[in-house]
Amino acid sequence: MKIGVVYPQTELGGDPEAVRAIGLAVESLGYDHLLAYDHVLGATHDREPKLTGPYTELHPFHDLFVMFAYLAGITQRIEFTTGVLILPQRQTALVAKQAADLDLLSHERLRLGIGLGWNYVEYDALGEDFKTRGARADEQIGLLRRLWAEPVVTFDGKFDHIDRAGILPRPKRSIPIWVGGMSEAAFRRSGRFADGHILMGTVDGAQQAWARIEQYLAEAGRTSVGFGRELPIGGQKTPLEMAETIAQWRDAGGTHASIVTMGKELRTAQAHIDYIAEVRHHLDREVQGRAS
């Protein structure tokens, strides 16, 4: 199983030195990937309709493509995972271009997790329709893959229109697209279009969600073999409890796990690094125990 770390976007005040330190630590400690959450704008919640999501204008978020491009230049091995990029609030052709360049410049280290988001204020500010975001995402996934593969694309969809145009340079592969979310619509979207799914919550809840995704894969005539399953794992866990939960997810069939250090009252980048270092210690001991 691939094990990574979620970058603690909301807790380090947008500190560039924290980005560098944590990115380098994730690689040096032997983790497989760095996952990061996405928001373009934070918004005050006191409005109508009410906003009920977990973030406000007080929570910092680095731009994922910019942050990962920076980290690609100072690391050699770790994968970069958008977990998730709010795709429907963005222009499809621009995402195709940004993702292609990041994948090329990082030597094929991008995994593009996509989702719909919950903040209609972001959509309004970016000029996209919040109400049609699900249908738009379905259309965007196929168009992204065409833009990465074809020199010239003609596309006349409900949301995007391209007349004999393409991006260059194109990536050397079809960048993996994973869907994130715990709604029935997200499970269906994964079954029809995705290379993997980013789940949420507990191991038991993720297993139940996976059963639904398997049904949608079968309905689409697709196999679950090679289909990825990632669970970001948070909560008030000690490093040992975190390692034990990762092992539970592995034993349940998970292919990827990510350590969430946010919400643990870790006040500095070094405190976050110390936590993931201790988790790594317990993970290595568990592997040694299974091998003996």
Set out the residue ranges of the language-model regions.
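Active-site-adjacent structural elements that line small-molecule/cofactor binding pockets in enzymes
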Residues: 1-292
